[in-house]
Amino acid sequence: VYIASPYKVLAVRESQRKAQAISIAQQECLKIMRECEGFTPVSPILQFSYLDENKHRDKALQMGLELLKACDYIYLSKHKDAKYSQGMQEELALAKKLGIKELVLELPL
């Protein structure tokens, strides 16, 4: 399961963005691990966290899309800033184009 979660759109200080994005991605991966037995969550934010956002953003986005192509499902983060994420919308559009199903969890509030 490809985990699409927000990064650039996060409403935090620039100095806190990477740490916040990693934390959100970790939470979403743990959610899939707990709720979807037999599914393996993968996150481009976690996978490529060693890259410098300022120097390698385009390469990270490209590698993330390659990672998506290898997945059977895409899961969209429910973080409050996610609905404004252009990157997540692009990931979802590619997933739909490739026939990758969106995984939707119906969790109680």
Locations of regions flagged by a protein language model:
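Catalytic phosphate/metal-binding cores of nucleic-acid and nucleotide-processing enzymes, i.e., regions
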Residues: V1-L109
